[in-house]
Amino acid sequence: MQRADLRNVAIVAHVDHGKTTLVDAMLRQSGAFGAHQLLTDRVMDSMDLEREKGITILAKNTAVRHGDLTINIIDTPGHADFGGEVERGLTMVDGVLLLVDASEGPLPQTRFVLRKTLEAHLPVILVINKIDRADARPVEVVDAVYELFIDLGADESQIEFPIVYTNAREGRAALDAESVGESPDLKVLFDLLVERIPAPTYEEGHPFQALVTNLDASPYVGRLALCRIRNGRVKKGDSVAWCRHDGTIQRVRLSELYVTEALDRVDAPPEGAGPGDIIAVAGIPEIMIGDTLADADDPQPLPVITIDEPSLGMTLGVNTSPIAGRDGKKLTARLIKSRLDAELIGNVSIRVLTTDRPDTWEVQGRGELALAILVEIMRREGFELTVGKPQVITKEIGGKLHEPMERVSVDIPEDYLGVVTQLLSMRKGSMESMTNHGTGWCRMDWLVPSRGLIGFRTEFLTETRGTGQLHHVFDSYHPWLGELRTRPNGSMVSDRSGPTTGYALTNLQERGAMFLGPGIEVYEGMIVGENARSEDMDVNPTKEKKLTNMRTSSSDHTIPLVPPRQLSLEQALEFIREDECVEVTPATVRMRKVLLSAQDRGRKRGATKALV
């Protein structure tokens, strides 16, 4: 049976191709908001971090009306680091809008989200967005998408997809690229969506079944479980069977039942919700993602969602620096552990493992960005942390050590072709293909070890003067490629505590790039700059000028201080080596040696050489 009055669709794309902007336009044109309402751009991006970085981190759903139909739209992240959100989003829908930039074309993350879509056997509508760009090339982009479908092993029915061209920012859509400017609205897209995305199917008379795909919390009713109803009906106050991961089944009562209208959760109608509806239920405090809610008298669990394995890990623990506790309020191991446990409840793509230290844990995820976002969120919540260098997660396959490889796509001006090729070759990358668009820009596709990309972005942007674009996504596990040295320069390490002085920094800036200005409190073992040479250098950034009562024939020369290079959290995590870590507080991000004392570091170096 089908529910003709409902459609469930996910919007998937590479990061920053305009998914959230398109949802904004669909909400406005469906009458979801009153004409008097003032809306921010990207209303679906509700987290501060999402607005700051211009990316979607969490999968969210909204509902719009089109005539007599309700269309549930899932806005998924375009970044593979948040792939767990993409996979969960796809379990809730019957079709997909694949959004591709009219100029950039399909990129590695497009490949990632499309692969997930094809594995789920979902029909696709191709949306070529940003058609108003001066460098738009819709014909070539459509051809590239066809090639991507074939490359990913799509069958004939999947390759026969309809195409619509849009300008999401202005809310226009048309069936050919030239007509987009004349189109008044997105009606073409809405009509195509209703026509080509199948209505939810269900079995008549089948007992109630719903799979929990996400969790949320309300200050009034506690934990909310978000699920899509597969079969049957349910209403507020019903008793249902809660089928857990471990196979146990418990009878529970649904204290609240909500459905989505535009961006708001509202009480479900008195008759409840039926097959295909995306609902939020309250009344089960310990429910987890992947659990099934089923008929109390005939419980039939649904298959659990499979999530890709994490490929990167880093240690995260209590702040152990000499000046810990000055900025944050949450300092203890107990608070950090309870926060990580809370993160595990809603974030299925990370794992938390114990280490040999009781105040430190290993957090594993899909990539640097996902892990850095978690640390940034905790920092804003008042935590102080010590964060280790991100390390790849290796596997034993057939008795041999294997490491994760990433598919890398770079768009660069032709002038930087040589230097970027050299950078990626040094990191044991192998070039797969190179395309010259004839516009002075070229695109290269590489296969590079994940560990070779740690710290690569900053160097890449420096060498291309900020013009290059870099995108990468996990590909597969390959045999270990041997030793890899990624950072050629050493660190400048403070050899004592105290405030930095302009006099000391003036002398030190000749030796390398400084990370701090004058008047900043430092401690022994803290990294204050990047050495121009390959080895580490212990320095005194607190040195003051000696004053005498002797007059000299020449006055002091004024040497201007170069402004310090201030690193963000992501840049700091990329910069550090294995024997270094990042100190994170609500106010600052500092880098330091794991062993603060110069004597301890010297002893360890001596012991390492003796072993060799």
Where are the predicted features?
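Structural and coupling elements of P-loop NTPases
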Residues: M1-V612
